[in-house]
Amino acid sequence: MAYRDQPLGELALSIPRASALFRKYDMDYCCGGKQTLARAAARKELDVEVIEAELAKLAEQPIEKDWRSAPLAEIIDHIIVRYHDRHREQLPELILQATKVERVHADKPSVPKGLTKYLTMLHEELSSHMMKEEQILFPMIKQGMGSQAMGPISVMESEHDEAGELLEVIKHTTNNVTPPPEACTTWKAMYNGINELIDDLMDHISLENNVLFPRALAGE
């Protein structure tokens, strides 16, 4: 099957582990989820046929849950428990680890200078963002008023873009989240946690941008 003309966001939701494949190739399926596979591959100078072949293998597996057809209230509850609550646990711990690594290894050229600052910025932005969703937008959608939520949704999508930009800064600061040979246990654990955060946040944004928001605006 030809996947090249399909949007990344749609592929990430319909094919098991496609999101992990896109992460491997550094393709943005959340904020950039509307771009086709062909366009995303061309921008990264990748062979689209190779990626299509990998997607075809993944598509042979059954998908755990197709959120594209789930009730909006169920999607919202899932987002809060699976992503919002998780981010609230992840970021404070990562900030503590980054503070320690930057202090203890300050004299090493490979130290991720500024990482604590960028993680703190992401924590502050996401905390405000998630609170607005939980207190304003999500209740509107659950009450069937999603079609009137163009303003709040536009703001949320803009904030998603800002979070995505911060993730790029964090990846750049950490050599694409790759620990150097001399990294201590805390350093390695922190990078594992950052990779997990990036995966979670990209899946979180993809579910909102590519499923919840369009369906809410359509009046479901």
Curated annotation (Swiss-Prot):
Disruption phenotype: Mutants show a severe growth impairment under nitrosative and oxidative stress conditions. Mutation increases the sensitivity of the bacterium to iron starvation, increases the intracellular levels of free iron, and decreases the activity of several iron-sulfur-containing proteins. This is Iron-sulfur cluster repair protein YtfE. Gene3D superfamilies: nmb1532 protein domain like. Di-iron-containing protein involved in the repair of iron-sulfur clusters damaged by oxidative and nitrosative stress conditions. Disulfide bonds: none annotated. Induction: Induced by nitric oxide. Negatively regulated by Fnr and Fur, but no obvious Fnr or Fur binding sites were found, suggesting that this regulation could be indirect. It is found in: Cytoplasm. Pfam families: Hemerythrin, ScdA_N. The gene is ytfE. GO terms for molecular function: iron ion binding; nitrite reductase activity. Belongs to the RIC family. YtfE subfamily. Homodimer. One of its GO terms (cellular component) is cytosol. GO terms for biological process: protein repair; response to nitrosative stress; response to oxidative stress.
